[in-house]
Structure formats: structure tokens, C-alpha cells
Amino acid sequence: MSGADRIPAAGAAPDSASGRAAVASAYQRFEPRAYLRNNYAPPRGDLCNPNGVGPWKLRCLAQTFATGEVSGRTLIDIGSGPTVYQLLSACSHFEDITMTDFLEVNRQELGRWLREEPGAFNWSMYSQYACLIEGKGESWQEKERQLRARVKRVLPIDVHQPQPLGTGSPAPLPADTLVSAFCLEAVSPDLASFQRALDHITTLLRPGGHLLLIGALEESWYLAGEARLMVVPVSEEEVREALVRSGYEVRDLRTYIMPAHLQTGVDDVKGIFFAWAQKVGL
């Protein structure tokens, strides 16, 4: 089914200023710790099973960076949320990393981990697994030290604005690489808004630069504490089409089907996609 033919998910707002405002309002009830428990603690956060969703995401990222083609000086993580796992393999390839999120509570959660404050979420199992699959002999402590040292700033972002980081951003632009995990589909009222958000973040990337995009397939809602948040359902083909429309060559697109034992009632996700895309141009 093409984007033009897709019927909006039940409860989804129309693609309009009011629709985007409704999304922003719903996110004011977002609870970072509940989100982390739902998705990054067991069972979904169990990294002992190599067929689990966590190992799959980490392998996709590690294998892509291992090609040596995705490198440079600057990287921007779009819509980081309260998570850092998406940068564990990236941090050895980029010396200047910018993390971003729309919500202050998520930026605060990231700050606690970056400053090693008591009570910060423990990502050590993810760091250990990333070191294991990279096979460089690096300790997880060294991995985390490097990531903390290379994250230079945590900034507000609004992917629905033509200038997502605003004017006069301290982030070096354009970036050599963008990473984004579970952001665009989770904050877009419909596919048209998803496409525009992708267009907007693409302005932050240099021609020839790379985008690594992770997201939910065919998901319409998820829970984060008291918040029940609407998601625009996307298919693998719709992701591919959106990337091409935004001026990318799709280098790799993989999918993971969520097994029954990981369908825990915190969302209705059917699977996960990982896309590696390169912005056309020199």
C-alpha cells in the first residue's frame, strides 16, 4: 500500500498544526523511566538471547560502522529520547557528537548518564554487548568513557520545524552523519508529516553523508507511564519510498519481526526496521 493510499491510524490526528500540537501535548505526559523499563529492561532488554531485539539493533549498527564507510568528525543523533545505546558503535568513529530531544525530561535523563550521576539508567549490559560484537578487545568501561567524552552537547530539537535545531545552533552543521532511533514515526500524526520531518532533518546532513535510521514497523501506539502515545504505522516499503523522496540512496534496509514473547502489551509494534541511507550529492 502506498503512502497516498494509507488510511490514517485510529486516533491519529490530521496532518496540521493542530495535529502536531496534539502530539506535542501528549508527550508532556511521557515518563522516561517507564519507557526505559518497558523497552530496555528484560524481557526486551535481555541481551542473553542473540535473537532478541536488543542484540539485533546493536548488530545492525556495529556491522554498518564496521564497513568503514560511515565516518567523519561530526554526528547528530536526532530525537535521542532517554537512550544512548544507538551511539555505542558510533562513538569510535566521530569525535563530535550532538544528542537531541524535544522533551526536557529526556535531555535531563541523558545528562544524568553523561555526568555519571547516582540513579542514572544502567546501560552497561548494552555497552558490554557492543564491545563483544565489535571484537576490538575494548572494555565496556572504555566504551562508555569514550562516548561520554565525545558527546559535546545535548540540545532541544523539533523535527517538524524547517530548521529542527533552530537558528544559531551550537551544533556544527552540516553533520557528516545522522542517527535516529524511534523518533520520526513516533512524533508524526501521519505519513505526510513523517515525510516532511525526514526532509527537515536531511537539511542537517552534508551531501554524501549518511543516515542510520531505526524505527517501528506497523505500530500505532505505545505506553510510557501514564502516556499512551499515537504512532504513524509505517511499512518497510513506505520507509524506503520516504528515504528516496528525501534524496537518499538506500544502502541497506533490514527488518526484524517482533516475536510473541516480546509483545508485552506496552505497544502494538509488529517489527523493527534498520535503514542505512546516503544523501545524494557531492
Curated annotation (Swiss-Prot):
<keyword id="KW-0597">Phosphoprotein</keyword>
<dbReference type="InterPro" id="IPR029063">
    <property type="entry name" value="SAM-dependent_MTases_sf"/>
</dbReference>
<feature type="binding site">
    <location>
        <position position="181"/>
    </location>
    <ligand>
        <name>S-adenosyl-L-methionine</name>
    </ligand>
</feature>
<keyword id="KW-0127">Catecholamine biosynthesis</keyword>
<feature type="binding site">
    <location>
        <position position="267"/>
    </location>
    <ligand>
        <name>octopamine</name>
    </ligand>
</feature>
<dbReference type="GO" id="GO:0005829">
    <property type="term" value="C:cytosol"/>
</dbReference>
<feature type="binding site">
    <location>
        <position position="40"/>
    </location>
    <ligand>
        <name>S-adenosyl-L-methionine</name>
    </ligand>
</feature>
<comment type="pathway">
    <text>Catecholamine biosynthesis; (R)-adrenaline biosynthesis; (R)-adrenaline from (R)-noradrenaline: step 1/1.</text>
</comment>
<dbReference type="InterPro" id="IPR000940">
    <property type="entry name" value="NNMT_TEMT_trans"/>
</dbReference>
<comment type="similarity">
    <text>Belongs to the class I-like SAM-binding methyltransferase superfamily. NNMT/PNMT/TEMT family.</text>
</comment>
<keyword id="KW-0489">Methyltransferase</keyword>
<dbReference type="GO" id="GO:0004603">
    <property type="term" value="F:phenylethanolamine N-methyltransferase activity"/>
</dbReference>
<dbReference type="InterPro" id="IPR025820">
    <property type="entry name" value="NNMT/PNMT/TEMT_CS"/>
</dbReference>
<feature type="binding site">
    <location>
        <position position="35"/>
    </location>
    <ligand>
        <name>S-adenosyl-L-methionine</name>
    </ligand>
</feature>
<feature type="binding site">
    <location>
        <position position="106"/>
    </location>
    <ligand>
        <name>S-adenosyl-L-methionine</name>
    </ligand>
</feature>
<feature type="binding site">
    <location>
        <begin position="158"/>
        <end position="159"/>
    </location>
    <ligand>
        <name>S-adenosyl-L-methionine</name>
    </ligand>
</feature>
<protein>
    <recommendedName>
        <fullName>Phenylethanolamine N-methyltransferase</fullName>
        <ecNumber>2.1.1.28</ecNumber>
    </recommendedName>
</protein>
<dbReference type="Pfam" id="PF01234">
    <property type="entry name" value="NNMT_PNMT_TEMT"/>
</dbReference>
<feature type="binding site">
    <location>
        <position position="101"/>
    </location>
    <ligand>
        <name>S-adenosyl-L-methionine</name>
    </ligand>
</feature>
<keyword id="KW-0949">S-adenosyl-L-methionine</keyword>
<feature type="binding site">
    <location>
        <position position="219"/>
    </location>
    <ligand>
        <name>octopamine</name>
    </ligand>
</feature>
<keyword id="KW-0808">Transferase</keyword>
<dbReference type="GO" id="GO:0032259">
    <property type="term" value="P:methylation"/>
</dbReference>
<feature type="binding site">
    <location>
        <begin position="79"/>
        <end position="80"/>
    </location>
    <ligand>
        <name>S-adenosyl-L-methionine</name>
    </ligand>
</feature>
<dbReference type="GO" id="GO:0042418">
    <property type="term" value="P:epinephrine biosynthetic process"/>
</dbReference>
<comment type="function">
    <text>Catalyzes the transmethylation of nonepinephrine (noradrenaline) to form epinephrine (adrenaline), using S-adenosyl-L-methionine as the methyl donor. Other substrates include phenylethanolamine, octopamine and normetanephrine.</text>
</comment>
<dbReference type="InterPro" id="IPR053384">
    <property type="entry name" value="SAM-dep_methyltransferase"/>
</dbReference>
<feature type="binding site">
    <location>
        <position position="85"/>
    </location>
    <ligand>
        <name>S-adenosyl-L-methionine</name>
    </ligand>
</feature>
